[in-house]
Curated annotation (Swiss-Prot):
Leader sequence residues: 1-26
Domain Gnk2-homologous: 29-134
Protein function: Possesses antifungal activity against F.oxysporum, T.reesei and C.albicans. Weakly inhibits the aspartic acid protease pepsin activity. Exerts antifungal activity against S.cerevisiae and F.culmorum through its carbohydrate-binding specificity. Acts as a lectin that stricly recognizes alpha-1,2-linked mannose moieties and interacts with the yeast cell wall mannan polysaccharide. Can interfere with the fungal actin remodeling resulting to the activation of an actin-dependent cell death.
Protein's UniProt name: Antifungal protein ginkbilobin-2
GO cellular component, one term: extracellular space
Length: 134
């Protein structure tokens, strides 16, 4: 009887430890692929402001919009509109989705060298942005 209780306690402890590992696993932000437009965003371009605002919108809202979110940010004074889409794997948590997209937003300009349009895939998330609707 005592052995059975010890086995049950061991199994319960093992199950709890396994659950903790699963729950604390961070988003996988390893680079997978990219496709970058050859045109670059001109320094000081009004499009750059629209693009950064649109990327912030993607980062903040994708996890709460079914893990697939499209948006655009119009510019004032004739500045080009920035169009974007972000997705996350359905199997990750909302906080991991947001963390993955935050990581990608911080890296996307260096990955694509300030391209006017880009598609970048990390293991757990994806962002596409363009100067035209898609």
């Amino acid at each position: 009887m005592k052995t059975m209780r010890m086995n049950s306690a061991f199994i319960l402890a093992f199950a709890l430890a396994a659950a903790m590992l699963i729950l604390t696993e961070a988003a996988n932000t390893a680079f997978v692929s990219s496709a970058c437009n050859t045109q670059k965003i001109p320094s000081g371009s009004p499009f750059n402001r629209n693009l950064r605002a649109m990327l912030a919108d993607l980062r903040q809202n994708t996890a709460f919009s079914g893990y697939d979110y499209k948006t655009s940010r119009a510019g004032s004074g004739g500045a080009p509109t920035a169009y974007g889409r972000a997705t996350c794997k359905q199997s990750i948590s909302q906080s991991d989705c947001t963390a993955c997209l935050s990581n990608l937003v911080n890296r996307i300009f260096s990955i694509c060298n300030n391209a006017i349009g880009a598609r970048v895939q990390l293991v757990d998330c994806f962002i596409q942005y363009e100067q035209r609707s898609f």
